[in-house]
Amino acid sequence: MTPWQQAAADDAALMNDFQAICSFGGRLSGTGQDKAAMDWALTRLREIGPDVRLLSVPYDGWRCLSNGVTLLGETPLHLDCVPLLRSASTDPTGLEGTIIDLGAGRPADFERAGDAVRGKVVLVRHEYPFAPDHVHRRRKYDMALAQGAIAFLIANPVPNAGPLSGS
């Protein structure tokens, strides 16, 4: 663990705030989780200082118009999902492929898989930061693309916690 990570882990107030903001879920705009997290943050910041304001700022954005994941088989299983921000579109008929499970999706997992990733749908587990061996989902995505994956899935390891979001 780096010195700053240790300092963050040792700061009880920081870790309480971190756990609180994570408890709202993905906080993707328009989900309700975003508003709940913002309301919490405004309340928390007002405890620290009196001059706290919410400012609306226009920005260019990306919006998903539709999404879906179905495990094919004897009885197809439709899974809840949310695309990573700025995900590429598939053609209107979708995309079909074989899943390769790379566990935590660390560099060593991708190295072990080697050419087996090419042409497959890569599945990795989501993990939260502040662990010394944490790999951000964007890095996992980049490794999957670099090795020729046709799609990328991140599974939430927390039961019934819902789909994940982010970039």
PLM feature spans:
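Noncatalytic luminal/extracellular "stalk/propeptide" segments of secretory-pathway proteins
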Residues: A7, D11, Q19-V121, E127-Y128
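Short, compositionally biased low-complexity segments
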Residues: L14-N16, S165-S167
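BRCT (BRCA1 C-terminal) domain core and associated BRCT-interaction motifs
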Residues: D60-T70, L153-N156, N160-G166
